[in-house]
Amino acid sequence: NRRLPEQQVVNGTPEFWSIGYLTDVILTRDPWMHRLDLARAIGRGPVLTADHDGVIVADVVNEWARRHRRPYRLELTGPAGGTWGSGTGGEQIAMDAADFCRVVSGRPGPDQGKPSGLLATQVPF
């Protein structure tokens, strides 16, 4: 799989992305996040489903967990939510699934403040 010529910096670490990662992952997540942004801008909540949005959220959670590599328990609420975890004794997080994705994308809402702990681990969108 060919890689892009320039490095991307994620969580302070430079990394190379493959063209496949860009087309299969980023070009799915980015428009999805814009959908959430537009819904927020017009004051309407997005209509999320487990079948579509839940798959994107699960993909984000799995990459987030691979990036931080620490024990955790995550409970995401809403139609796109679910429960994930790895290891024991780790941080426990409970929040809305769409808010989780906003936070780990580096675009928390004004009421969410600066992320800390495992939520400071960003995932590319």
Predicted feature locations:
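Structured surface interface patches that mediate subunit assembly and partner/cofactor docking
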Residues: 1-125
